[in-house]
């Protein structure tokens, strides 16, 4: 009985993540893990999570290797005025607390009118990163900075 409840909970977690990716961070204001920063003329929504929360199908569609030691950074950039998704170039890095730097390679994913930028970040259990991402649309350049601690599931 406990196993069945745990299994149902995992299915629900995976379903919720698929929904969040499908409709985008634009509509995830009520998700506690969702975060937003206002950078110039943009609303930048971002979330960092473990890739094990992705279903195998979603991971495969986005060429993401699911692992308890892989984190996923998902970012969307919206125009502050009309809330349209912005096509930008992202470069970034993640630095752990002992100074090891890992480059972030972002992949642009378009779903309808939504645009997401995804990067995979390998990590060790309970590893904390300072993440810095340069965002450039050719007219404006801003830097998104945040910290996140990853846990192996």
Predicted regions located by residue number:
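Short, aromatic- and glycine-rich surface loops/edge beta-strands on solvent-exposed regions
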Residues: 129-136
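Short acidic/polar inter-strand loop motif in beta-rich domains
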Residues: 137-144
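Aromatic sugar-binding surface patches on proteins
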Residues: 111-118
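N-terminal secretory signal peptides that target proteins for export/translocation
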Residues: 1-13
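N-terminal signal peptide c-region/cleavage motif recognized by signal peptidases
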Residues: 28-30
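Short edge beta-strand/loop segments characteristic of extracellular beta-sandwich folds
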Residues: 72-78, 118-120
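Bacterial N-terminal signal peptides
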Residues: 15-26
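Beta-strand-rich domain onsets/edges
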Residues: 34-72
């Amino acid at each position: 009985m406990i196993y069945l409840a745990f299994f149902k909970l995992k299915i629900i977690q995976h379903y919720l993540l698929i929904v969040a990716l499908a409709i985008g961070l634009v509509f995830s204001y009520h998700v506690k893990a969702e975060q937003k920063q206002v950078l110039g003329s943009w609303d930048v929504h971002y979330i960092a999570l473990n890739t094990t929360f992705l279903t195998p199908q979603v991971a495969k569609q986005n060429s993401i290797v699911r692992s308890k030691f892989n984190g996923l950074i998902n970012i969307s950039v919206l125009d502050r005025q009309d809330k349209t998704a912005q096509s930008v170039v992202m470069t970034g890095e993640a630095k752990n607390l002992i100074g090891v730097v890992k480059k972030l390679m972002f992949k642009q994913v378009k779903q309808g009118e939504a645009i997401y930028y995804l990067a995979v970040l390998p990590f060790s259990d309970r590893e904390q990163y300072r993440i810095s991402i340069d965002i450039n649309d050719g007219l404006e350049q801003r830097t998104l900075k945040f910290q996140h601690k990853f846990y192996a599931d």
